[in-house]
């Protein structure tokens, strides 16, 4: 696979590629954001990826999720993502968890073996538990804030959670993490105000029992995912130096 990453080596150097090949990154949530995180990490040569998601690919995912096609509908998202990654880099090691991350299942995940964690889940309890466990294990984590109901992909920023503005999810995260003694967290967020959708209050087809289906377009969650992956890559390379 040396030729596959030769252009990357020109930019990052051989030692950086070796570091990435030896790295293990866990991506929690393989959806519109997390799928693009995995895609970029795989194409940059990260050697071991943990894929965590309980969902299967739905028709309503096709508008924004890189793993979603008419051929993958019904497959576990982790299976579809694994197949795609191995088509990109057959040497990659994949660990799959076909489950939903919850505070009570946190013990099933080897946080002390991860070099980096990406939070791309969409429930507050899971996000808080992820950050808390990474903090306890001294593992770097980057979190995705709200990407739904937005149209401006140029509005995303990388910041400390304490410095975010205009993001309702970030506001709640900041308050809840402060209660847990955690005051700093790297996040990707947007200051674009959420756009009201016509079907507000209707059930979410991707998450039975949930209300307020968020609107989405292909060019917003994908950009957030690529930014998240870029931060992971840059941080892993810095840690190697």
Where are the regions a protein language model picked out?
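Conserved S-adenosyl-L-methionine
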Residues: 42-48, 136
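Glycine-rich phosphate-binding loop and adjoining beta1-alpha1-beta2 segment
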Residues: 46, 51-89
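N-terminal charged helix/coil linker that caps or initiates catalytic domains
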Residues: 1-26
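Conserved SAM/SAH-binding loop
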Residues: 98-106
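Glycine-rich phosphate/adenylate-binding loop
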Residues: 2, 21, 109-114, 126-129, ...
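Conserved N-terminal Rossmann-fold NAD(P)-binding element of oxidoreductases
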Residues: 27-29, 52
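Hydrophobic/small residue at the entry helix of a nucleotide-binding pocket
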Residues: 33-34
């Amino acid at each position: 696979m040396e030729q596959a990453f030769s252009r990357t080596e020109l930019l990052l150097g051989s030692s950086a590629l070796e570091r990435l090949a030896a790295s293990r990154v866990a991506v929690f949530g393989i959806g519109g954001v997390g799928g693009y995180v995995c895609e970029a990490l795989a194409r940059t040569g990260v050697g071991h990826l943990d894929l965590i998601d309980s969902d299967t690919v739905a028709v309503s995912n096709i508008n924004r999720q890189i793993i979603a096609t008419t051929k993958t509908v019904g497959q576990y998202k982790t299976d579809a993502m694994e197949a795609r990654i191995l088509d990109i880099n057959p040497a990659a090691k994949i660990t799959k968890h076909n489950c939903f991350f919850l505070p009570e299942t946190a013990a099933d995940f080897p946080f002390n073996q991860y070099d980096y964690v990406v939070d791309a889940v969409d429930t507050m309890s899971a996000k808080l538990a992820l950050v808390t466990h990474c903090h306890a294990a001294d593992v770097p984590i980057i979190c995705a804030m709200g990407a739904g109901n937005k149209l401006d992909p140029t509005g995303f920023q990388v910041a400390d959670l304490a410095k975010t503005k205009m993001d309702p999810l970030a506001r709640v995260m900041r308050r809840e993490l402060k209660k847990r003694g955690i005051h700093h967290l790297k996040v990707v967020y947007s200051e674009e105000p959420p756009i009201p959708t016509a079907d507000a209050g209707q059930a979410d087809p991707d998450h039975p029992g949930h209300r307020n289906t968020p609107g989405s377009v292909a060019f917003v969650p994908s950009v957030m995912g690529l930014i998240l992956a870029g931060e992971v890559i840059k941080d892993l390379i810095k840690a190697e130096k």
